[in-house]
């Protein structure tokens, strides 16, 4: 179901006059959980940009650049190579791509750290107040109200601490 919403989002971009749309296929994510061997996205997530390209003729209209390259998030060097290759039309240099990839992965580490720190705060609160909490597991697209149907707000109405699965996966 979430993938179906992409059609509307792409149409919205086109209606706003956006002429370059970058929607990469991502088969492999970073393997950030030690001792696991599966960091492969589901086929829908990994390949839906191809489906969109095949099913939305407006993406093939003159003047529209629809970019759907394959990226392997687990291989930083390959990411640099692919960025240079895919953005050659914009004259992106290898140095620029390396800087961008390094900054993106560094910021992702900051984000993961921040999420874990918030989780630790919630756990400390639960211990201090002798209360239970909820670990809310999901995918990034679950923040869309069309998809989550207000479940996060309903959970919040119980006044329990909510912890992201990303905050505690390492425990």
Language-model-detected regions and their locations in the chain:
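An N-terminal assembly and electron-transfer interface module characteristic of large anaerobic redox
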Residues: 1-171
